[in-house]
Amino acid sequence: MSSINITNVTVLDNPAPFVNPFQFEISYECLTSLKDDLEWKLIYVGSAEDETYDQVLESVLVGPVNVGNYRFVLQADSPDPLKIREEDIIGVTVLLLTCSYMDQEFIRVGYYVNNDYDDEQLREEPPTKVLIDKVQRNILTDKPRVTKFPINFHPENEQTLGDGPAPTEPFADSVVNGEAPVFLEQPQKLQEIEQFDDSDVNGEAIALLDQPQNLQET
């Protein structure tokens, strides 16, 4: 059983201009206290054929991780268009929200993102060079792809078992080519996080979220 469960993800400011920051309101529950922080990442897939074009837009550490229910807003800059091939800017790509504990990724939420011009004439007659300030992104929030990976949340309890736990396989295929995302070396520590009791989660607090998304595992 996982020690951390995502209970809700709300995509804010969507649709939005391509250059606007991403904003995700994330609610999750912690079933057992953890010694280390959780690491949340937002990854933009720049090319379906070449993962070297993936961009880690944000990586933050969230803690302490005590038993309870939590909610925070993850904000990330838009991807750098100069690091995306011109032919890959317009069209459909993937955005990945991941969470890891002690360098072990245990959940990944994938969204399709459609980038297109907000002007009908530009859509019908696209310019040779992409006009990035005219591009609008639309995150398709109705059917996020959720993948869970079994990990050891309490390795300190198995220090006497010799070599430790065997490598684990994911419950479902990755959203993108079955590959793990690129990790940042020095993630930032996120300070603003809200904890609320069970009555909030079961009652009004969750109801206040705009356009809550039901996360269905695949």
Curated annotation (Swiss-Prot):
Phosphorylated in vitro by TOUSLED. Signal peptide: none annotated. SUPFAM superfamilies: ASF1-like. Pfam families: ASF1_hist_chap (PF04729). It comes from the Eukaryota. The keyword Chaperone applies. Keywords: Chaperone, Chromatin regulator, Nucleus, Phosphoprotein, Transcription, Transcription regulation. Interacts with histone H3 and histone H4. Interacts strongly with the N-terminus of TOUSLED. Belongs to the ASF1 family. This is Histone chaperone ASF1B. The gene is ASF1B.
